[in-house]
């Protein structure tokens, strides 16, 4: 932590098409080597695929998917008397969003479809339907927290 106090959070500018900060954050999360244009193109094509397949607004499907991915609980390692305990803690709202976006992008990249547009679109659709690898990651995280409930009193 800096000596001058906590660092101020930088506000992300909303994206030009959907005027959403969430979409802008997803674009930033997908970006590799600073190529924002490529990242935007991939995301917008994915949203077109989603709209085509569902007939619903892509933004609504994306928000539902993200809501299904974002974790409520996670475990943090805490050292007590020479032993490490996995202590369940609640996830802060900003971290929930960050984890949700991170898992969405990571598991979309691991999928088997040919293009990233298809991978991302399918992962978002799966997440919106409460299936897919990103939702499984959330369930595993919650299971871990539930299994280590006994150590909840070590919370800080």
From Swiss-Prot:
Keywords, sorted A to Z: Ribonucleoprotein, Ribosomal protein, RNA-binding, rRNA-binding, tRNA-binding
Gene Ontology MF annotations: rRNA binding; structural constituent of ribosome; tRNA binding
S-adenosyl-L-methionine among keywords: no
InterPro entries linked: Ribosomal_uS7, Ribosomal_uS7_bac/org-type, Ribosomal_uS7_CS, Ribosomal_uS7_dom, Ribosomal_uS7_dom_sf
Annotated GO CC locations: small ribosomal subunit
Gene Ontology terms describing biological process: translation
Domain of life from the UniProt record: Bacteria
Function, as annotated: One of the primary rRNA binding proteins, it binds directly to 16S rRNA where it nucleates assembly of the head domain of the 30S subunit. Is located at the subunit interface close to the decoding center, probably blocks exit of the E-site tRNA.
Family: Belongs to the universal ribosomal protein uS7 family.
Subunit relationships: Part of the 30S ribosomal subunit. Contacts proteins S9 and S11.
Record-linked NCBIfam families: rpsG_bact
Protein name as annotated: Small ribosomal subunit protein uS7
Gene giving rise to this polypeptide: rpsG
